[in-house]
Design a protein with these regions (language model features):
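Alpha-helical transmembrane segments
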Residues: 249-257, 307-324
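Alpha-helical transmembrane segments of polytopic membrane transporters and translocases
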Residues: 110, 143-165, 196-198
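Helix-loop junctions and terminal segments of transmembrane helices
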Residues: 162-184, 196
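Residue-level signature of transmembrane alpha-helical cores of multipass secondary-active transporters
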Residues: 11, 15, 48-51, 55, ...
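Short alpha-helical transmembrane segments in multi-pass integral membrane proteins
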Residues: 39-93, 100-104, 191-211, 217-221, ...
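Interfacial segments at transmembrane-helix termini and the short loops linking adjacent helices
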Residues: 145, 193, 210-243
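Membrane-interface junctions at transmembrane-helix termini in multi-pass inner-membrane proteins
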Residues: 1-15, 238-268, 278
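Membrane-interface helix-loop junctions in multi-pass transport and translocation proteins
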Residues: 5, 9, 20-59, 260, ...
Length: 350
């Protein structure tokens, strides 16, 4: 509701409170339970309980904030009552609660379904990789577990750029949908292109940095990890840009009322990932490197599908050169400079 009103401050405070109380309460509960002699399983349960406590605190904050700042808007917004500032000549009435619920479900279910499908496909993919490493590539269970473990470490860093883009996608949805509702299609198109440009400015340098500096990053964060780590991170660094692009494109499609199309792209991308991994991971010479390649290919496919949907459904073709040219050029120069400086430092400093 606050985001729909263009107010992101409550969301920021809410997220900070949730994380803060989750960590503090979880640590306190785990420590108290362990000192009381309940053992590690119960202590772990106490730490997990901190997640619920953080969620409850954040919910209470939003309820209090809503009552303090938006309570004056609640009373008039009931079925059959004119909205504030309406004149007697206005025929438009506020939608009923049932219609609002139906609209929310019709929009939310495809979005939630697409997210669930991707999570399910990722779970299937993890099982598939372990199985193909053993049954087809000929690795032992321990070797396959080590390879998939280092892939999981690279995934942690791979998810970092998307963490910066997700809040932006939340912010642009009401901006674009509001412009479309007012009939300001030109403003909606400009906002869409600006959002994609901001996404590129953030994700391209981060992706290039992860790719170029994969070796030192993995060695610093995971010094005793498997040697495959830097190569995996380098591939996933390239994929991270397409992940951010897909997130922004999904937000644009959802804001314009085409949320079902995002579900199609998510399912298609997940299936592509499974197919690519099925063949590549089975090759002993490729093994676990096939997993990040599958991720890269799947998100490239999703980005292209979303772009086509935006062009067809919205009758608008974003100017890709104007959006990506300068961020890409700057990122390449940055990557070259970072690689050269790291090489010099490693050579003379060690």
């Amino acid at each position: 509701y606050c985001q729909g009103n263009g107010n992101m401050i409550p969301t920021t405070v809410d997220e900070v409170l949730e994380v803060l109380f989750k960590v503090i309460s979880g640590l306190i509960l785990a420590s108290c339970l362990l000192r009381a002699g309940y053992g590690k399983p119960v202590g772990s349960a106490g730490a997990i309980l901190g997640v619920s406590i953080g969620s409850v605190i954040s919910l209470l904050y939003m309820i209090i904030y809503k009552r303090r700042h938006y309570s004056e808007l609640s009373a008039p917004y009931t079925a059959g009552i004119h909205a504030p500032n309406d004149t007697p000549d206005d025929d438009e009435l506020v939608d009923s609660a049932w219609k609002i619920v139906k609209d929310i479900l019709s929009i939310g279910i495809p979005i939630a379904f697409g997210a669930c499908i991707m999570a399910i496909l990722n779970s299937v993919d993890s099982k598939l990789c372990m199985n193909r490493l053993q049954s087809a590539a000929g690795f032992s269970y321990y070797q396959a577990k080590v390879l998939y473990g280092v892939y999981g470490k690279a995934q942690t860093l791979f998810n970092l750029p998307a963490a910066f883009i997700t809040p932006l996608t939340i912010a642009i949805v009401p901006e674009i949908s509001g412009a479309i509702a007012k009939g300001a299609n030109a403003a909606a198109r400009k906002t869409s292109e600006d959002a994609m440009r901001i996404s590129a400015v953030i994700s391209l340098p981060m992706g290039v940095g992860l790719t170029v500096l994969a070796y030192p990053i993995m060695n610093v964060l995971y010094p005793n990890s498997n040697a495959a780590g830097p190569g995996l991170l380098a591939i996933m660094g390239a994929a991270s840009f397409f992940v951010c692009t897909v997130l922004m494109e999904n937000a644009i499609l959802q804001a314009s009322g085409h949320e079902k199309l995002t579900m199609v792209t998510m399912i298609s991308g997940g299936l592509v990932k499974i197919i690519v991994n099925w063949f590549l991971v089975a090759q002993r010479s490729i093994n676990i490197y096939g997993a990040p390649v599958g991720t890269l290919v799947s998100y490239v496919v999703m980005a292209l599908m979303n772009y086509i949907f935006i062009c067809v459904a919205l009758r608008h073709r974003p100017k890709l050169f104007g959006i990506f040219a300068r961020p890409l050029a700057a990122s390449v120069l940055m990557g070259a400079a970072a690689w050269a400086i790291y090489g010099l430092c490693a050579r003379f400093i060690g």
